[in-house]
């Protein structure tokens, strides 16, 4: 009986962290208590965060939230691109691509390999953001469409 309660607490805890919307331990405590785990307190949540290796990172809305390491999976060349690219935005002269953490350099390398023939002058990549500079004279909207098609294809 105790193991079943502990297992259900662990499952609820992991489910909450997968939502990537809890920025503080007290928010996690409140959510668990609302789910019926009334005995949970901040120190218990702190121990669980440590036990499962949870970290605080930015979600897609740029909020600092707790998440589990398996949700921060490191991208590799086998990862579908559409799962790694979160957003593509632009102004008149520059394209900004937001990716999952750690994926920007992988995707920038792909874009660089496509190169000038497709209208890409160059890229600069950080951990989760890529700046794409189009070649002179190219319609930026056409380039964005081509980039989005590239992400949709299963490479």
UniProtKB/Swiss-Prot annotation:
Q: Which Gene3D superfamilies match?
A: 3.30.1360.40, Winged helix-like DNA-binding domain superfamily/Winged helix DNA-binding domain
Indicate the transmembrane segments per the record.
none
Question: Which pathway or pathways does this protein act in?
Answer: Amino-acid biosynthesis; L-arginine biosynthesis [regulation]
* Annotated keywords: Amino-acid biosynthesis, Arginine biosynthesis, Cytoplasm, DNA-binding, Repressor, Transcription, Transcription regulation
Q: Which GO terms describe its biological process?
A: L-arginine biosynthetic process; protein complex oligomerization; regulation of arginine biosynthetic process
Q: Which domain of life is it from?
A: Bacteria
Supply the InterPro entries for this chain.
Answer: Arg_repress, Arg_repress_C, Arg_repress_C_sf, Arg_repress_DNA-bd, WH-like_DNA-bd_sf, WH_DNA-bd_sf
SUPFAM superfamilies, per the entry: C-terminal domain of arginine repressor, Winged helix' DNA-binding domain
Primary location? cytoplasm
Gene Ontology cellular component?
cytoplasm
Q: Which Pfam families match?
A: Arg_repressor (PF01316), Arg_repressor_C (PF02863)
State what this protein does: Regulates arginine biosynthesis genes.
Which PANTHER family did the record assign?
ARGININE REPRESSOR
Q: Which NCBIfam families match?
A: argR_whole (TIGR01529), PRK05066.1 (NF003457)
What's the family?
Belongs to the ArgR family.
The protein depicted here goes by the name: Arginine repressor
The gene is argR
């Amino acid at each position: 009986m105790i193991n079943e309660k502990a297992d259900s607490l662990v499952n609820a805890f992991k489910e909450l962290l997968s939502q990537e919307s809890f920025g503080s331990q007290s928010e996690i405590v409140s959510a668990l208590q609302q789910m019926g785990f009334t005995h949970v307190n901040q120190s218990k949540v702190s121990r669980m965060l440590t036990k499962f290796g949870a970290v605080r990172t930015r979600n897609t809305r740029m909020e600092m939230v707790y998440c589990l390491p398996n949700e921060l999976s490191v991208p590799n060349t086998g990862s579908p691109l559409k799962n790694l690219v979160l957003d593509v935005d632009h102004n008149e002269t520059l394209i900004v691509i937001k990716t999952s953490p750690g994926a920007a350099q992988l995707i920038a390398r792909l874009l660089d390999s496509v190169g000038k023939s497709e209208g890409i002058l160059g890229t600069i990549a950080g951990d989760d953001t890529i700046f794409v500079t189009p070649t002179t004279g190219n319609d930026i909207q056409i380039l964005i469409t081509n980039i989005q098609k590239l992400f949709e294809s299963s490479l």
